[in-house]
Amino acid sequence: MINKYALLINLVVFSYQLNANEISGTSGDVIAVKTDDVKEDYLSYRHDQSEYLILGLPYVYETSLKRIKDIDVEVQYKNFGESRITIKDLSKVDLNQKDRKRANAEALLIRAAIQSYDNTISPSFNFKNPVIGIISSRYGKKRYINEKPRSPHLALDIAANLGVEVSAPLKGRVILTGNFFYTGNTIILDHGFGLISSYSHLDSSIVEEGKMIQQGELIGRVGETGRVTGPHLHWTVYLNKEKINPEILLKDNFLQNLFEASQDIL
């Protein structure tokens, strides 16, 4: 009997050690992992003589284990609240066959752009706010449109008056522009190594695909194109193809704080 108790205690301790050593983070967050095994095409930084891999965590509906860049990460669920909006133009909600075909084709275009991977640009993570306005809907909220559940809101909405300037929050190359069914006038920027951002519902775009944009450079103006309830900027950020929370990138000393909160692969 004593041996059985001893075995049970050992199993509990071993399980605790496994959990303690587990790499973890919150849904939609960005984490830094200290490791000696950094591949050439991974987004990483050298700091204080150590290598840090930067990972974007996906939105999850429940706490779950995800494989990201050859690393097992426990992504913890977070309740971001909910958002309920009413769209009076029902043709933007229940699509006819023509509009659905268009929206699906545009989704493929955007998905292809997100696969972009430019290792000639090294992102600084020193993000600036792309527009002066008021946050009207935060990342991660469960979305209801006309009281029907839809996909969660994986972006940051910033309300502003029509025509307010939208500028690049970080240096990047324009990889896609277009007027799309859902997102209206849209610009997508590649900041390098899988860090990508998009700007939707613009009134106008003044950049062309292929152009390198500097931080703070004007790229467009706030509008209400596409499926919207009013003028605002819909700002989406991707890291390793996952939609992350843009708001956290605006914090002071973001990268330095990542290093200080880093986790080790043992």
Predicted regions and their residues:
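Sec-dependent signal peptide recognition
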Residues: M1-N10
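Residue-identity detector for threonine
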Residues: I2, T26, T35, T63, ...
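Hydrophobic h-region of N-terminal signal peptides that target proteins for export
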Residues: N10-L18
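Non-catalytic extracellular/periplasmic "stalk"
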Residues: N19-I134, R138
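Catalytic cores of peptidoglycan-degrading enzymes
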Residues: K128-L266
